[in-house]
């Protein structure tokens, strides 16, 4: 199953909740696309009824309707750190886990807005 289908299914499950959230932060932009599809099928408008935020800023995120708010992580840094950590583990230079913080940037577009409290 592709990520968009997971987003579609996740959104529909959330919609069935008695107290559906007003915002969803999904694991990646492809899942966000699935959430967009589900929202459309259910009849909810983004961002008027629900805010959606993605992760990884795929090139098409800014062309979605409305443009997707997303978090961009420098993937080259992530890959570089992953290779370095793998080399350390393979060479038995590191036994303990290491916490890595990567630079990220929030790209605020039109898929989020402050919603009034639901009654």
Name every feature range the model reports, one short phrase each.
Residues 1-5:
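Short beta->alpha junction loops
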Residues 6, 10-118:
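Flexible loop/turn connectors
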